[in-house]
Amino acid sequence: MIVGVLKEIKSKENRVAMTPAGVEQLVAHGHTVGIETLAGEGSGFTDAHYEQAGARIMASPKQVYTQCAMVMKVKEPLPVEFPLIRKGQVVFTYFHFAASAELTRALIASGATAVAYETVEKPNGSLPLLTPMSEVAGKMAVHEGAKYLEKIYGGKGKLLGGVPGVDVGTVLVIGGGTVGVNAAKIACGLGAKVYLLDSNLERLRYLSDVMPPNCFPVVSSPANIRKYLQEADLVVGAVLIPGAAAPRLVTRDMLKLMKKGTVIVDVAIDQGGCVETARPTTHDDPIYEVDGIIHYCVANMPGAVSMTSTIALTNATLPYALQIADKGVERAALENPEIAKGINIMAGKVTYPGVAQAFGLKYTPLEKVLGPKRRVSAYAVGADRSLAPAAVDAALRDEAIAYYQTAFRAFKSGALQLP
């Protein structure tokens, strides 16, 4: 397969979808890799580095889209790219479709297969391609929030960690997943008092055991959100429903409860935001104010620490990219339900329920798009029906038992959060 890697064009997006080390592995598997010129510059990788790894340097986005069967990116395609996406082409990137009807309709119209990093899902419910960037964004949320608390940026002039004789700041983190936990850890490390809200009691029990003593896991409810907003100096929105629009948990009316100069960092902005007054911003113009509350809603936060982010992203995506390149996207989806979960749009059909629900579009199960003889495996994309019936039953039984054993262990450990 010819695999293309594009230079990102979103404002101040310095990441690239593949490192030279990743390219080397794709080439070792017999694939041709085309890298748009200067694609890795923002992450410290030159065209020469990619050529040494075996890549071909391509002069333009058009050349990449025209010549490559699979195109890899970091952020979603922008409108200028929509006409370049071809029928049958695989686009492998963060899409966050639920935040953009325009993007969703463009990919439907293209006839391409959209494999979204953020919905590739393991049997235990974890999101392996979202996790590394969630870790980065969670850590950055507190760094950025602490900065904009400074008076020179319009904040209240408060140091989160305080100093001897002066009280520490208070941080409210809404959501106890990967983003929330990483944000809470950084805030605790600075010495702040941290309230970490989540709706899953088993998860809260786990967090109570593992988080530092200045972190207080609390049940998430409208009443508790209102209560802790009044105390908070920094609020981090870290809510996620995979593939779907984020719920609006902080309403405009709630801003009136907050102290002037408080900072909100809405990491959920990729999925529409969990704060009613949130709208996407950029690294060029990252903040705005509503009712005296500073909002930081940069949709590509990890792009500012591109060297770390690019390596972490490649570590996560490369195994899946290799499977798609080696087998083709249909066979890869049939054999690996994790990849099947990542397919949001294929052949003009919406194959991910959260995306269809976000815009009132028709949802088509992936197995119907793949065809009547190509069924999914036990929990996502089907056993091979070419096997004898008894063998199929045994395969499904064994896979189902293994899946539920894994899910039960994950639930007990807190890694699996039930709605």
For the regions a language model picked out, list residue spans one by one.
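Glycine/serine-rich phosphate-binding loop and adjoining beta1-alpha1 elements at the start
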Residues: I2, E8, P79-G169, V298-N300
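Rossmann-like nucleotide/phosphate-binding core characteristic of flavoprotein oxidoreductases
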Residues: I2, V33, K349-L396, Y404, ...
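An N-terminal-biased, well-structured beta-alpha scaffold segment characteristic
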Residues: I2-S110
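Glycine-rich phosphate/diphosphate-binding loop of Rossmann-like nucleotide-binding domains
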Residues: K7, S11-H29, G34-G40, G155-G237
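Generic hydrophobic/aromatic pocket-lining and core-packing "Φ" positions
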Residues: V23, D47, T104, V142, ...
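Short glycine-/small-residue-rich Rossmann-like dinucleotide-binding loops
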Residues: A69, K75-E76, F95-H96, S221, ...
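Adenosine-phosphate binding glycine-rich loop
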Residues: E118-L159, I269, C274-Y379
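Rossmann-like adenosine-cofactor binding region
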Residues: D209-D291
